[in-house]
Amino acid sequence: KAGDVLLLDDGKIILEVERSEGLKIVTTVIQSGVLYSNKGVNLRGGGLSAHALTDKDKKDILIAAKADADYVALSFPVNADDVRETKKLLKEAGSSASVISKIERAESLADDVIQEILNESAGIMIARGDLGVEIGDAQLPAVQKRLIKLARSSDKIVITATQMLESMIANPVATRAEVFDVANAVLDGTDAVMLSAETAVGEYPVNAVKAMSDVCLEAEKSRRASLSRHRLHSHFEDVDYSIAMSAMYAAN
């Protein structure tokens, strides 16, 4: 509708909607740039009506099933129904693959919605690119910490991804800020950190993998990292479990 702001290619191009005419949208370019094919479109604040599973996604699920994939990453789930549909398609294709839900939509962050998504998924990926475009980069750090904590309390896998070592696409060494970013994700309890363009199109893919591995190994030596290694499911709120966990931590 008029006044909506569309963000293209991870926010590099910004358009403001003037009016819509059926399937045609007339916009004013607020921030220009070169738009390449297959780039994403986000609505500032969330609310796009696009379905999580496209026809191409459904075909790709069949390919993943034939390839005997262990995991399938579901992009842009709005709610748990999207996860359930993906699991249904995998089952019908004869696949036992688990679903990792990529948290990229503002709508999926509501307390009840994210918990239902976690309950239906093997784990979540904190996909900071599209998520940051929708909610704003300033909110990302707190949201990332919240999602890691929620995943761990639900005993689910959590992966932190996007621009972890972005500068290493073109440089052989990471910035200090990137080192801190990776280390803090590990210290918060993420199960995995993931490289994207750094290894897909970067000039120093091996350096990037080694740099990330080195940071993770050093962060895991921290006492804080050892304390976050155990998942505290809600049943540990019982007195007996709490005493047992306290004894274990004291012994360690």
Where are these regions (language model features)?
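Non-catalytic helical/linker scaffolds that mediate oligomerization, partner binding
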Residues: K1-N252
